[in-house]
Regions:
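N-terminal intrinsically disordered/low-complexity leader segments
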Residues: 1-28, 98, 218
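Hydrophobic alpha-helical segments that form the core
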Residues: 3-8, 170-190, 201-213
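Amphipathic, non-transmembrane alpha-helical scaffold segments
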Residues: 26, 34, 76, 80, ...
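Generic hydrophobic, amphipathic alpha-helix propensity
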Residues: 29-37, 54-55, 79-91, 155
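Helix-turn-helix
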Residues: 32, 40-74, 78
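Hydrophobic alpha-helical connector segments
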Residues: 78, 92-124, 174, 178-181, ...
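Amphipathic alpha-helical packing segments from all-alpha helical-bundle domains
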Residues: 82-93, 118-121, 128-131, 138-165, ...
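All-alpha amphipathic helical-bundle segments outside canonical DNA-binding/catalytic cores
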Residues: 103-109, 142-147, 164-180, 197-205
């Protein structure tokens, strides 16, 4: 499917029905529908996502979608949850592999790169989740908000560790710093395209911005 595939993490490989084996034809069809919905939602948004477009992209008849999802809203809710859940799992996995001697501030910069690459290059699900977060009614955001809180906790620890190491300016409010950084990273889905520069350049500029904005030497 498209430029970005399904969520890679086991945790975010969706709440498949217990009757569907992951390798079964039904499970594969369900995943195709989710992939297609993520792609369409990332491009057209909550208001513009039609099941007919999802079906066309998934190479299915639209009524087939209802076998797997009771409604359009159920499908959207699953995509929105999966996008954040997978990004959280990806960041946790990346940070787990970072050598112990890497400084707390550099761990933040690694998180910056992981976030940007995931939302801009790896996952339509994450792009859709970030781009549509403010458009969904509250009843569709319960699981997404829970995942956002867990993702934010990873960043809180990163910033807390950097403060303890003296690598963040003491006058900065840690919560505001975190929200400003994440807000800037999330906004990249709205303005970036390869025509505006390579993803590598976006990452390096963002890392420089964050380092110089947070560091006492900045």
């Amino acid at each position: 499917m498209a430029r970005k595939g399904s969520p890679a993490s086991t945790e975010a490989a969706f709440t498949r029905s217990a009757t569907l084996r992951p390798d079964s034809k039904s499970a594969q069809t369900r995943e195709r529908i989710l992939d297609a919905a993520a792609h369409v939602l990332s491009l057209k948004g909550y208001a513009g996502m039609r099941l007919a477009d999802v079906a066309e992209y998934a190479d299915l008849q639209a009524p087939a979608i209802y076998y797997y999802f009771p409604s359009r809203e159920d499908l959207i809710e699953e995509v929105m949850w999966a996008g954040i859940a997978d990004m959280r799992a990806q960041l946790a996995s990346v940070l787990k592999e970072v050598p112990a001697d890497v400084t707390p501030l550099d761990r933040i910069l690694i998180a910056v790169e992981t976030h940007l690459r995931h939302e801009l290059e790896i996952s339509d699900y994450t792009t859709a989740s970030i781009r549509n977060a403010g458009q969904l009614p509250d009843n569709l955001r319960t699981r997404q908000l829970e995942e956002e809180a867990k993702y934010g906790e990873i960043w809180r620890k990163l910033i807390k560790d950097a403060i303890a190491a003296g690598q963040i300016r003491p006058e900065l409010d840690r919560y505001m710093a975190q929200m400003l950084v994440l807000g800037a990273l999330n906004w990249a889905v709205e303005w970036w395209s390869p025509k505006r520069g390579s993803l590598e350049k976006v990452v390096s500029n963002a890392q420089s911005f964050v380092r110089n904005g947070l560091s006492p030497a900045g």
